[in-house]
Regions:
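Cytochrome P450
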Residues: 1-405
């Protein structure tokens, strides 16, 4: 089967539930395969990369760039994306990234541990209350989703009472990000949500300027207003929207996808209580095995060859992160979930200049949450089939029914 046909199959419902057989089929074509036709309704990809080394090479190469989205001037969502560091190229990306990198200090990141511990303790209490008497409880609803939302709210400076409203506006934006999401009605809903979030942050920035707090947003504003970094309020708003969304979703899908995997390994769950080092191994292996972000794209700066495959100047390469993290040339027995496997870095947080700026927060959430979860509920068990979110771009669970034992 040619790469074009395999890629077209990835859009089917069955592939969204389990894309890995198709990833294996692409691996058999080599680390990168040319595409003749691209995908109707999406960016016309010129090649698809599944080999770890090729994907890693392109992500680290600063000359490969993010191609602008058509119609971005007419849509609030696309303008938001393209004025954030996640979607820009140097020098704008470098300018924005430097501000966040210098604000995410070791001291600030260390201060997040007590926040996570407090939130985890509260959510474990709620989990116990909802699961009393052997009742089935949705792990995603009660634990995995609230955890990063509450932590990020405290870290960033979003009032906790605004979180339900905020999260409702994140969903239409995520729907647009999928390969099948580029439809006019989906974009219209995402535009509306993006504008509401922009208005929300504009008001919050104004309040933080008048009354600074000990949160990330106040620290960013101080550095900008002191002239240490050049960022407009519009760019700050775009980056806050994208940063919160990315950090929030990564942890939800890390925990939601990870729980069924961990429950398949009772030897691991029995060893997790009190063992944050093992918890970090689990975090890294979950991110490899079920990457929350399944693909990224980059455009070639010139006519180039990648592993012998020609890519023309400005041609877009589809980088299948989920496939690269299952590359048998990189990972031994890649379809086996094995925390503590050889210390090889996955691409779960990306690589290169666009490496996830919130990775340390997500790792800390997993490191703290997993040992405490299985210490509190050693008999935790699945109570039904987990339900996936049904996206190709993002991979995770929307529901994981459990009993507490």
């Amino acid at each position: 089967m040619k790469a074009d046909a395999i890629l077209a199959e990835l859009l089917s419902d069955s592939a969204r539930a389990n894309p890995y057989p198709l990833y294996h089929a692409l691996h058999e074509l080599g680390p990168i395969a040319p595409l003749a036709e691209g995908l109707a309704g999406a960016t016309p990809f010129r090649a698809v990369a599944t080999g770890y080394d090729v994907v890693d090479q392109v992500l680290r190469d600063v000359t490969f760039y993010k191609k602008g989205l058509p119609g971005r001037q007419e849509h609030t969502l696309l303008t938001t994306f393209e004025t954030s560091m996640m979607f820009t190229n140097p020098p704008d990306h470098t300018r924005m990234r430097n501000l966040f990198s210098k604000t995410f200090t070791p001291r600030r990141l260390a201060a997040i541990d007590p926040i996570i511990e407090s939130v985890v303790g509260s959510l474990l209490d709620q989990l116990e209350e909802r699961g009393a008497g052997g009742a089935t409880v949705d792990f995603v609803e009660v634990f995995a989703a609230p955890l990063p939302a509450l932590v990020m709210a405290a870290f960033v400076g979003i009032p906790v009472e605004d979180l339900p409203w905020y999260q409702a506006r994140v969903r239409p934006i995520d729907a647009f990000l999928d390969l099948n999401g580029k439809q006019p009605d989906v974009l219209e809903r995402a535009d509306h949500a993006a504008q509401e979030l922009r208005d929300f942050y504009a008001d919050l920035i104004d309040r933080r300027r008048r009354d600074p707090q000990q949160d990330l947003l106040s620290a960013l504003i101080r550095k900008i207003d002191a002239g240490e970094h050049q960022l407009t309020d519009a760019e700050l708003i775009s980056n806050m929207i994208v940063l919160f969304n990315a950090s929030f979703l990564t942890t939800i899908y890390l925990l939601g996808s990870g729980l069924p995997l961990l429950l398949s390994r009772p030897d691991v769950t029995a060893a997790l209580p009190g063992n944050e080092e093992l918890a970090l191994d689990c975090v890294h292996e979950i991110l490899r095995f079920e990457s929350p972000v399944q693909f990224l794209t980059r455009a070639a700066p010139d006519d180039v060859e990648l592993a012998g495959v020609p890519v023309p100047k400005d041609g877009v390469v589809l980088l299948l992160i989920g496939a690269a993290n299952r590359d048998p040339a990189r990972f031994g027995d890649p379809d086996t979930f094995e925390p503590g496997r050889e210390k090889l870095t996955s691409l779960g947080f990306g690589a290169g200049p666009h490496y996830c700026v919130g990775a340390a927060v997500s790792r800390a959430e997993g490191r703290i949450a997993l040992p405490r979860l299985f210490e509190r509920f050693p008999e935790l068990a699945l109570a039904g089939e987990p339900v996936g979110i049904g996206s190709l771009f993002l991979r995770g669970m929307q529901s994981v029914p459990v009993t507490l034992g």
